[in-house]
Amino acid sequence: MMVEMKAVNENLKEQFVKRNKLAICATLRELKKNDTSLMVHHSHGQFISKILDVVPDNNLFVFDLGGIERENNRALYAGSLSFVAEPAGAKVEFNAEIAKTVTYDGLPAFSAQIPELLYLIQRRTYFRINTPLWPPLTCRGELPDESVFLFTIKDLSLGGLSLYTDRDTTGLLTEGDIIKSVEMDLADHGFFCVDLQFVGQAMVKVVDNKGEVQLTQRLSFKFPSLNAAQERDLQQVIFELERLQNEKKKRFQEL
């Protein structure tokens, strides 16, 4: 079964495509150099990986196994794989088939032929994922009036996040304000200390756990200065949240 590439309008793909092998290898090497996470989709599931090596002379690249042995076995016999990576300000997509399992630095890994086509899409917007209701992910910091806040993260991307709060923050923030050293508690997914730049706020209607509609404030922020390590780790979190969401949807569909 062929896994189709997503997220790029068919009419626009040609302006993003790379067909030159040297250019494709350069992009793969850049993903390796920056330790960028890859989301690997196939007909039986998905897993998170990283490129370990690029070997143009053998027309191969090597990538890491996923964390679950069952998923690795499924991927090995799935046929075509669809790879998606999201380095800063861009999106990389390509298809490949696993050639075989190999040993790399003493550990098992997958190898595949270097793709004939690769899409490098420069983006102005980032993929945004809604966070789970439980456990709640939170941000803690200090507002310009020196009061401490603890707000719930509603959604998250490499570009920024949105926070929900019942607290009236009207007039406390103006567009462009930067809140320094905000503590992002992402539960099992880790802890980050970041700066947030205020974009805007709005009143929105949400449904609480009792099924009742409530009004709450939505505060939007962007990340003005993520370093490479923070960006890499945050991308890993976003991939993991997406994987968990997809698994949950699949379970509901099977009921």
Curated annotation (Swiss-Prot):
Gene3D superfamilies, per the entry: Electron Transport, Fmn-binding Protein, Chain A, predicted glycosyltransferase like domains
Gene Ontology CC terms: bacterial-type flagellum basal body
Gene it is expressed from: ycgR
Ranges where the PilZ domain occurs: 122-240
Record function comment: Acts as a flagellar brake, regulating swimming and swarming in a bis-(3'-5') cyclic diguanylic acid (c-di-GMP)-dependent manner. Binds 1 c-di-GMP dimer per subunit. Increasing levels of c-di-GMP lead to decreased motility.
Superkingdom as given in the UniProt entry: Bacteria
Quaternary context: Monomer. Interacts with the flagellar basal bodies.
Family: Belongs to the YcgR family.
GO MF entry, a single one: cyclic-di-GMP binding
InterPro entries assigned to the protein according to its UniProt record, in alphabetical order: PilZ_domain, Split_barrel_FMN-bd, T3SS_YcgR, T3SS_YcgR_PilZN
Matching HAMAP family: YcgR
Entry keywords, A to Z: Bacterial flagellum, c-di-GMP, Nucleotide-binding
Primary subcellular site in the record, as a coarse category: other
Taxon lineage: Bacteria, Pseudomonadati, Pseudomonadota, Gammaproteobacteria, Enterobacterales
Protein name: Flagellar brake protein YcgR
Pfam family name, one: PilZN
GO biological process: bacterial-type flagellum-dependent cell motility; regulation of bacterial-type flagellum-dependent cell motility by regulation of motor speed
Subcellular location: Bacterial flagellum basal body
